[in-house]
Amino acid sequence: LQSSSAASDVYKRQLFLGFGAGGIGFASSLAFFCASIYSTVILKRQLRDIPTTKEQVDKPSLRKKFFSVGTYILIRSLFLTLFMAYLRNRASLMSMEEIALQHILLQLWSVGYIFVDAIAIASQTLISELVSKKEKYQKSVLQKELVSVTTAISFFLAIITVLFLDNFVEMFGDDKFDLYIDLQLKLLVALSLFIGCYAFLWDGVLLGLDRAKEFSFLTVASSVSGFLVCTYLLRTQNTISTLWIGLNVSLLFRSLLGYKYQK
């Protein structure tokens, strides 16, 4: 949070000094630099508290596992980034208002799933600890708690979106988007947050269960499915709602596969 706040302050100063888009890049780079230094310092402090062990480590096997998991995560991130970029760039073929609205909606959507993404990251650690104790995740107390918390968050985000989406958008663009924000768009954005909560939770669960291959595959498959649906529907309905239909299809596919691969 501190690094983000510092980056925001630097960003404003760079814009004031006339750096423009360069200020954004500078602020982002500074934020990542500060975050990396901070995390490195904290990690070293934590490592000092861990007792040393004489346990023999199979370094070649560990190295192979590291690069294997890293490769799967890289492939997953690549397809997910490309799909989200497609949703942004496809809006650029619409009106200026729709371009701006799509950008705002995706930013709000990103803020929405931060809550469950935090749970997903925590679940990965908790599940790994559970598995290391030779206990099963399926039908465990941990599984029930994760699902119940995620369900509560997903309902909350969906309801808030339906009721106040136009108000959130007005915070950034006044009332010039009223023509484009109808009930259908509100429901689609709300549904994406509802389904997305489970999709991101299953990501953390699969990584905790050491199923990086499935974790990567379901994101690749869901991104491709969302892209195909968008491409097909946009031929006859070139609207923002169509883009969100594609995103919902992708998230639904991802959440269903994520649930299946847990078993």
Go through each PLM region and give its residues.
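Small-residue-rich transmembrane alpha-helices that serve as helix-helix interface/gating elements
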Residues: I24-S36, A221-V224, I240-G258
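Interhelical loop/hinge segments that connect adjacent transmembrane helices in multipass membrane
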Residues: G25-S28, S39-T81, K263
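Short membrane-interface helical motifs at transmembrane helix boundaries
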Residues: F156-D178
